[in-house]
Structures are given as structure tokens and as C-alpha cells.
């Protein structure tokens, strides 16, 4: 009898601890309707193989052609087609940037999603698959050129943007595609037309889509301590052809123009998805992923919405498309909001700063946070050729990178760049780390308390 009672007690405690330690099971709503995600080209092939899906897809495309959302939803045949497609792989399909049939994939995506929202959304969902890589992956790939272990004084005085151009020239693919876009974007057509902008944009897209990020990022996001370096960074995309124009259009007009093209629309939506400032994360970036934001920014270069640095200020990071909000009328607030997603975006600013510093969220040391003050503006100077050294003329007293601050042990002031520098260094989180279930937290604590309260009663019962 005693052995039987002891066995019951042991079984009770074992089951109680198992229930506390095991993670909760997925909710039924999460399991319902789950299906593996495929790219839209493959999803279209799967749909075409099914007569019901194929016919409904054709119907929906006819419904979306030339009709607004309310008219489409009022049609029962259109509603039925939409309901069928919502259960097909087409509805959840996504695309990969730079994939072989990217344009076809995006056309399929927008053929379904373009007319399903009421009016024009400010932020559209990205048609691209989520980015899972991190900046630390880029750093590992670029370590051969990073100068790790070099003399700190030499590193502080070097022009990182010049070093990036030299590194590109050591790679055949990077050198070839860079030379191509430089040649095309610098080719004057006539006295009134300084270049063929369409061809320049195409050459830039090929460069940023086909050259690995460890080269392109170093040229776009190199850290600078002087004006010459910052001007070289600004000149990376040959802005006189690819970026600037005679007049600045209204930003909302530029956005509307961009959204008439499936590729431009997709890259803009992806930028908003990955760089939209989030105040629920430590870095101000969605999912604390700097790499996703920088990739989305680079992905817009070579389109109507091409962004660039607005000046050659080495201490301030301000980027913008070539537009303003003049003539916005009653849409001025929306226009300013759109423009500030570039000019005053803490996620984008922190991501660029982090890359220049060689830091990522899961490899950043902890540090204090400083209030920001406006950095002084510096006049532009002409860019320099790759073989000409334009090392810093400001000396080591002007330090804008986190690593330089830590290495030299200087006292921090309240400058804007230091605020940005330390903002992203306030965490040691690894986003990829697994969850740890704490036995004495939350509901587990309450459940354990209940179990322990019931234990004496059970022992009395078993002893009888």
C-alpha cells in the first residue's frame, strides 16, 4: 500500500513538472490553413495545373481590370473567385529580389493584391520574402578587406570610401559592372541632355543586384570623418545623372509614378516594410534587422525613387529621394510623412551608422545613450579618383565611430553622431536566440503554487 501511494505521489509530481517545463502548444488558429510558401512563378504553375484555380484566377484578373474595389466586391462571381484564390498558394506567394524571373513573379503578385485594398495605401505589404541574414554575415564575408587588426591611428585617418572602391577593383565582377555604370552614366547625349538616365538606371540596378553586398555596401555606407570622403560616398551612384534633375517633383507625384512600375513599386514597398521606424525595437528597425533595411535601401537605386545622400556632411547622415513637398495642397501632411521616412528615419540612420562602425545588434557592446544636437553642415567638394588618397584632414579629434570612441577612451559629448552611435549599442540581444522558459515566471509560477498547495492534501489522502 505504501509503495502504491509513493508511486502515485511520484507520478503526480512528474506530470506537474512536465506541464510546467514544456512549451505551450500552438494555437488552433495558427495551425489552421497553414501551407508552405512558394514564389509566385511556381504558385502560378501550380494554379494552372488545377482547372478550378486556373479559371478563378482568370476571372479575378478580369474583375480587377479597370474596376475599383467596391465594384469588384459587389460582383458575386468576383467574390467567389477571390475566396477560391485565398485558399491557393497564389494568395500567399512571394518573390526573391534578383531572381531569374523577378518581373514575372512581381506581375503575378500584384495582379492579385493590387485591387484588394480600399484606395491607395500609404504603406503596402512587401512582395519579397523576408530577409533572414544579418549585418554580421556581411562582415564575415568582407573580413578579407576589412583591415581588422590594423593600426588604429592609420585606420582612423584612412578614407573608407576610397578603400571600398579599391576593394571593388580587386573583384572582376564588381570592377566590370562598376566600370559599366560609370561609363554609361557619364556619357553625355547632347548639350541639353547630359546622359541617358534610363540606361544609367539599368546599369545601376545590374550593379546592385549582381554584385555581392560585401562590396556594394562598403561603397554606399562607408563611414567618413572628412568632407572629401563623404563627397566620394555621395558620388557613388553618379547623382548628376541617376539622381538629380532640373526641378524637384512633388514627393507624392514621384511615389505615384513609381507605383505605375511593378519593380519600383515592389522596391518601395520593401523599403517601407524593412526600414519603417519602429519604436518597439531597440534599433528602431523592424525585427532589429539592419541588413534587411540596408538591402531594401540599395534595392531602390536605379528607379524613379532613387535615394541618395543630400550633401557631403561627414558627421550627419541624411538621405532623400529627389523630391520635395511644394504644391502638396491638402496632402502636405501625407507628403511630409512620406519624405521623413527617408530624411528623419532613425532605423535607416542607425543601420548606415552600424555598418560604417562594423557593428550589429548581436555583436554590439553596451554603452550609454546621449542626447542629440544638430551637427554643422559642411560645403561640398569635388570627388576624387580611386588612386588619389584623400585621408582625413580633421585629425583624430573628430571621432564619429563607436570603435574609435572605445579605442581612444575619449569623453563623449552631446553630438548627434554620438547619439546615433550609442543608440544601437544599448543591447546585447541575439535575435536568433531560442526562447528560455522561466519556471518561476508568469503563469508557471501560479501553476506551481497551486500544485504545491494541493500536495499536502494528496499526501494525507495517500497516507490513509
UniProtKB/Swiss-Prot annotation:
Subcellular localization is given as: Cell membrane
Instruction: Please indicate which superkingdom the organism of origin belongs to.
Output: Eukaryota
Membrane topology (UniProt)? Lipid-anchor; GPI-anchor
* GO annotation, biological process: cell surface receptor protein tyrosine kinase signaling pathway; glial cell-derived neurotrophic factor receptor signaling pathway; nervous system development; positive regulation of receptor signaling pathway via STAT
So which residues have sugars stuck on them? 52, 357, 413
Which residue spans adopt a coiled-coil conformation according to this UniProt entry?
none
Q: Where is the signal peptide?
A: 1-21
Tissue distribution is: Neurons of the superior cervical and dorsal root ganglia, and adult brain and testis. Low level in the substantia nigra, spleen and adrenal gland. Isoform 1, isoform 2 and isoform 3 are all expressed in brain, liver, ileum, spleen, heart and kidney. In brain, isoform 1 is most abundant, isoform 2 slightly less and isoform 3 is lowest. No significant levels of isoform 1, isoform 2 or isoform 3 expression in testis.
Gene3D superfamilies, per database record? GDNF binding domain (1.10.220.110)
Q: Locations of Low complexity compositional bias? A: 381-392
Q: Which GO terms describe its molecular function?
A: glial cell-derived neurotrophic factor receptor activity; heparan sulfate binding
Q: Kindly list the GO CC terms recorded for this protein.
A: plasma membrane; side of membrane
Keywords assigned? Cell membrane, Disulfide bond, Glycoprotein, GPI-anchor, Lipoprotein, Membrane, Receptor, Signal
Q: Where is the lipid attached (GPI-anchor amidated serine)?
A: 443
Provide the disulphide bond pattern.
Answer: 40-93, 47-53, 63-78, 95-105, 161-222, 168-174, 185-200, 195-241, 224-229, 251-323, 258-264, 275-293, 285-347, 325-335
Q: Which residues form the propeptide?
A: 444-464
Function, please? Receptor for neurturin (NRTN), a growth factor that supports the survival of sympathetic neurons. NRTN-binding leads to autophosphorylation and activation of the RET receptor. Also able to mediate GDNF signaling through the RET tyrosine kinase receptor.
Query: Family, per the entry?
Result: Belongs to the GDNFR family.
Write down the PANTHER family for this protein, in alphabetical order: GDNF FAMILY RECEPTOR ALPHA-2 (PTHR10269:SF4), GDNF RECEPTOR ALPHA (PTHR10269)
Q: How does it assemble?
A: Interacts with NRTN ligand and RET: forms a 2:2:2 ternary complex composed of NRTN ligand, GFRA2 and RET receptor. Also forms a 4:4:4 tetrameric complex composed of 4 copies of NRTN ligand, GFRA2 and RET receptor, which prevents endocytosis of RET. Interacts with SORL1.
What name has this protein been given in UniProt? GDNF family receptor alpha-2
Q: Which gene encodes it?
A: Gfra2
